[in-house]
């Protein structure tokens, strides 16, 4: 028996990464998981080294980031890798989630995998927001003020919760210090959730583009899919390096190179690009409390997909109507991102309201109706044949 199988610890690694049977038909969309693992490792390592030179005191936070950029050897590389790594992390995560939506990865027996994935998504958004505030530039200060103020919409106790989060009556030194502490902690929670995600996936194995069980047609992970993953890893690193070395500030906001000033309000307060769709949903609802509920509902609605999708065929590979509505949903999501960066004025508010309605309609109206229609067509075609 090979040593990797006889050793207790190596056998665990072997069963997950070497001999793990994978469907032979999986395509490059299944490589997003390995890229997300790479992104998480990059973020944790660069974050740890940056934390060695960062000061969470509100008077020193902005200056300490500049100190990392100017005085620490290769500090600029750490900072730009960490900042752009967050953007690439979300870009790959959105592609990973789109793959799950398109190929029905949320369907039984992988519902638990999907639920843990949604929790990872929420935790990653929290980590990104906390990290953005730690820079304490102008957009960081006002972003922290706006987002934490959302809790004031909670009846009776909202204002007390906001002051508890701030540690005072405004975003101040205690706010940045506790945000930094949480920002350091959350990635390790995400890493633990990733392990749980991986364990849940290991129970029934990966899905495949055909939407069938496919237990008889599988190949070992190592030798086939490890090298297939390496192709996308190298492509990812090339594109990532182009941003880090040649265009490091493209995905950021110029206002964040101005120290945070509570006395000067920016012309437009916007979060990072990867949070813009949900920011657009928040702004499309005039009522503050309903806007907050709608924004969080836009994330949690992902959890209802296993209940609303009643199709007898997993995934959209062979379903024309579902394909059409899926790509309309993707276009609508991108539109929400664009609207999130626009000023709150006509016609962007109205467009945001229509796009928000279509976003929720996809999960709660279109998916169940389309699955019913396609099931009917499937049974009619089966009977005729």
UniProtKB/Swiss-Prot annotation:
PROSITE patterns tied to this protein: CYTB_CTER, CYTB_NTER
Keywords: Electron transport, Heme, Iron, Membrane, Metal-binding, Mitochondrion, Mitochondrion inner membrane, Respiratory chain, Transmembrane, Transmembrane helix, Transport, Ubiquinone
Pfam families the UniProt entry points to: Cytochrom_B_C (PF00032), Cytochrome_B (PF00033)
Membrane topology: Multi-pass membrane protein
Keyword Membrane: yes
Cofactor: heme b
Cofactor note: Binds 2 heme b groups non-covalently.
Localization, UniProt: Mitochondrion inner membrane
GO biological process: mitochondrial electron transport, ubiquinol to cytochrome c
Binding residues annotated for heme b b566, in chain numbering: 96, 197
CDD domains linked to this entry: cytochrome_b_C, Cytochrome_b_N
Spans traversing the lipid bilayer: 32-52, 76-98, 113-133, 179-199, 225-245, 289-309, 321-341, 348-368
InterPro entries, alphabetized: Cyt_b/b6_C (IPR005798), Cyt_b/b6_C_sf (IPR036150), Cyt_b/b6_N (IPR005797), Cytb/b6-like_sf (IPR027387), Cytochrome_b (IPR030689), Cytochrome_b_C_euk/bac (IPR048260), Cytochrome_b_N_euk/bac (IPR048259), Di-haem_cyt_TM (IPR016174)
GO CC list: mitochondrial inner membrane; respiratory chain complex III
Alphabetized GO MF terms: metal ion binding; ubiquinol-cytochrome-c reductase activity
UniProt-annotated binding residues for heme b b562: 82, 183
Gene3D superfamilies registered for this protein in UniProt: Cytochrome Bc1 Complex, Chain C
Protein residues bound to a ubiquinone: 202
Entry similarity comment: Belongs to the cytochrome b family.
Primary role: Component of the ubiquinol-cytochrome c reductase complex (complex III or cytochrome b-c1 complex) that is part of the mitochondrial respiratory chain. The b-c1 complex mediates electron transfer from ubiquinol to cytochrome c. Contributes to the generation of a proton gradient across the mitochondrial membrane that is then used for ATP synthesis.
Subunit structure of this chain's protein: Fungal cytochrome b-c1 complex contains 10 subunits; 3 respiratory subunits, 2 core proteins and 5 low-molecular weight proteins. Cytochrome b-c1 complex is a homodimer.
Protein name: Cytochrome b
